[in-house]
Amino acid sequence: MQNKYPLLSQINSPEDLRLLAKEQLQSVADELRAYLLESVSQTSGHLASGLGVVELTVALHYVYQTPFDQLIWDVGHQAYPHKILTGRRDQMHTIRQKNGIHPFPWREESLYDVLSVGHSSTSISAGVGIAVAAEKENAGRKTVCVIGDGAITAGMAFEAMNHAGALHTDMLVILNDNEMSISENVGALNNHLARIFSGSIYTTVRDGSKKVLDKVPTIKNFMKKSEEHMKGVISPESTLFEELGFNYIGPIDGHNIDELVKTLSNMRELKGPQFLHIRTKKGKGYEPAENDPIGYHGVPKFDPTCGQLPKSKTIPTYSDIFGNWLCEMAEQDSKLIGITPAMREGSGMVEFSKRFPEQYFDVAIAEQHAVTFGAGLAIAGYKPVVAIYSSFLQRAYDQLIHDVAIQNLPVIFAIDRAGIVGADGQTHQGAFDVSFMRCIPNMTIMCPSDENEMRQMLYTAYRMNTPTAVRYPRGNAQGVALAPMQALEVGKGKLIQQGQKVAILNFGPLLNEARIVAEKHNYTLADMRFVKPLDEQLVAELADSHELLVTLEENAIQGGAGSAVNEYLQKIGKIRPLVMLGIPDFFVPQATQAESYADLGLDAAGIEQRIQAVVNQ
């Protein structure tokens, strides 16, 4: 490694980086970018975001005394360069793998990871808390939050900035704006003015003038307006952040490491809330990623020399099946509306957005708004479908209850990534949606066992006039044939196999694993389909005719489908031995989906072992 990366190989911590001359930093950035590309192409992971913040990462760790100074990355997709510079360079080959380093900043992993993240727009709120604590302790430490132009659109980010401005907290928010390539207003003039506005002479004169002019409000207001006008000429965005109480600097070139170091060095000495706007290019330095930053956002293993990603398998994903269903229904119903909170690609809605632009709404990273926006459409007679990841629906729980369920509005929730998601780890597992939805009156919850069932359930939800949820997993579908759409009888499961002694009640896509066990031991197998309303008649019949009941689901055991079965049996006084298989009471770490199923006992071998342990007692 030393021959290929002569500078980077010597950097085992930011302390090593800070020993280098400033003139060497661009070479460090070049090596870091090359190493990042080499590493991610061999492991899979998030690529384009990290390529875009290489210079910023080097400059931040060079100027700020991390880990004493607190550096917080929002979401964490862009934090791979940060991990490489903070002692984890030689472990990058394990990222996103079982027992490897975490795909996002993770407090348990490193002192340099101040906040564990994975979801967006949390950095500034945590940063305000950390900065307030530092002020109370007179610690002298600095707090820096790096947030992207997507994440900053979320309401939580503005709530935090509004609070920070009111508190006049010493902290720096850096907006990494990579929505477009470096534009004409990011150049010599902007870089020069950024140094002026962030410099000690300017800020000392400005702050001193404010104190003197407090007694002359007319002149004070004139000077304030003049400063705002000058900043506004350079960057119209500045007014918004200035009104929130931040001193706005920028935009500056986020790939000019000399200017970044100069500006950050100035801003580190400033008091109060500071806001630095930088412009970067997502995928910087690797042309295919620059040209297709969305495609190279998260990548599988690939050969970077060929300039293209490997083609996906021919079996469609559950997300693809959902997108196709949405298009099929939109052809028949112009009042069907598809809604996504900034997850068009992940949720399989690209084709729908192109074919039916008038029926498609991307509301940005605003899950709360997405749900209540859907409620408003339902009130007006439309048929909204909110396509959302299970872990992101958590962010809109009050809206689900207050704005949809209480009013019994026909909003369809297409819940993607339900269950075990794999390499993204704890923050992205879809482990809780059944539990937190099942207790809500008026909700109908469906768990398809394959893509055909999924289509029928989505169609069933479309035909209903109440809140509905269809939850389906990440990854490839089963490859079964798709039948013509037909509404299912609500609350009715189906018997897959009649057996003896043991009955397995399956909820969701683990049906094939259960089938292997049922066929081997001649157990009864039922595909329950609905968590709510539960097929109580089928549960009662199986309880009467079997010695042991086993529930199987990809959700937390607490409050899940198994709990629903247990509650019903208690209600009717049928006390039977019951084994509830699902996700235990801990946050499931990163691994492949297959590895997680095995670890949790949710594959065929694990299911068989758990059942046999009870049968043999």
From Swiss-Prot:
SMART domains according to UniProt: Transket_pyr (SM00861)
InterPro entries from the UniProt entry: Dxylulose-5-P_synthase, THDP-binding, Transketo_C/PFOR_II, Transketolase-like_Pyr-bd, Transketolase_BS, Transketolase_C, Transketolase_CS
GO cellular component, one term: cytosol
Amino acids binding thiamine diphosphate: H77, G118, H119, S120, G150, A151, N178, Y286, E367
This protein's UniProt keywords: Isoprene biosynthesis, Magnesium, Metal-binding, Thiamine biosynthesis, Thiamine pyrophosphate, Transferase
CDD domains: TPP_DXS (cd02007), TPP_PYR_DXS_TK_like (cd07033)
Superkingdom, natural source: Bacteria
Pathway field: Metabolic intermediate biosynthesis; 1-deoxy-D-xylulose 5-phosphate biosynthesis; 1-deoxy-D-xylulose 5-phosphate from D-glyceraldehyde 3-phosphate and pyruvate: step 1/1
Its EC number(s): 2.2.1.7
Alphabetical GO biological process terms: 1-deoxy-D-xylulose 5-phosphate biosynthetic process; isopentenyl diphosphate biosynthetic process, methylerythritol 4-phosphate pathway; terpenoid biosynthetic process; thiamine biosynthetic process
Molecular-function annotations in GO: 1-deoxy-D-xylulose-5-phosphate synthase activity; magnesium ion binding; thiamine pyrophosphate binding
Binding of Mg(2+), residues: D149, N178
Family matches, as Pfam families: DXP_synthase_N, Transket_pyr, Transketolase_C
HAMAP family in the record: DXP_synth (MF_00315)
Oligomeric and partner information: Homodimer.
Function: Catalyzes the acyloin condensation reaction between C atoms 2 and 3 of pyruvate and glyceraldehyde 3-phosphate to yield 1-deoxy-D-xylulose-5-phosphate (DXP).
Family: Belongs to the transketolase family. DXPS subfamily.
Protein name per its UniProtKB record: 1-deoxy-D-xylulose-5-phosphate synthase
